[in-house]
Amino acid sequence: FNINENTTFILISLKKDLKDSDIENLGGEFYNFIKKNSFKNISIITGSAQNKPGMDFIGHFVHGLKLKSYEFNIYKSKKVKNDITINLVGKQNTSFTKNKLKFKALEEGTFFTRDLVSEPGNVLHPDEYAKRLTQLRKYGLKVTVYDKKKLKKLGFNALLGVGQGSIRGSYLVTIEWKGNKSKSNPLAFVGKGVCFDTGGYSLKPARFMEDMTYDMAGSAAVV
């Protein structure tokens, strides 16, 4: 990389026994710094920290930086572009190469979850939520959508009772991944996916209403 009079050097001093989450938090703080100072081209020079066996400092650092860069701005008429180029300078260890795809998948999954949680209730209603989850089939997942008729047949009366106050229908979505051929018992994750509806009655005080749109965050996290 080229060094000129406009080059800014940032030195990061690391403490011993860093956890992966510490490195990711550091990457997030670094993103705040470069955004505040409008830096557009970043070169990260790897040092001794990256050379430790089994430690992927750069991978976790950039992962934290990318997670911090998330913005939900699809409804803004004027979108501020944060185009930042990151160059990695130096030899990367095998951990970095091996983890690149894993971090990419984690980032895409996290951003998908954040998009779901950030959508307003008049956009992400139950049928729209179920529709978006069916898109996961392209990754080889088995996605099954149970509508009102199927839920009634299966005896999901409590779930249907909650949805009676809405003009929209209720759904239950199951997502299955059978990537392990082991005969051991499968793991099941259950997330609450109650979508906020602006109609009907609410027993909650007004000051708690604005957070109701996050009532489906549990299911979004599971997804």
Please provide the spans of the model-predicted regions.
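Alpha-helical metal-binding/catalytic segments enriched in His/Glu/Asp
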Residues: 133, 187-189, 202-223
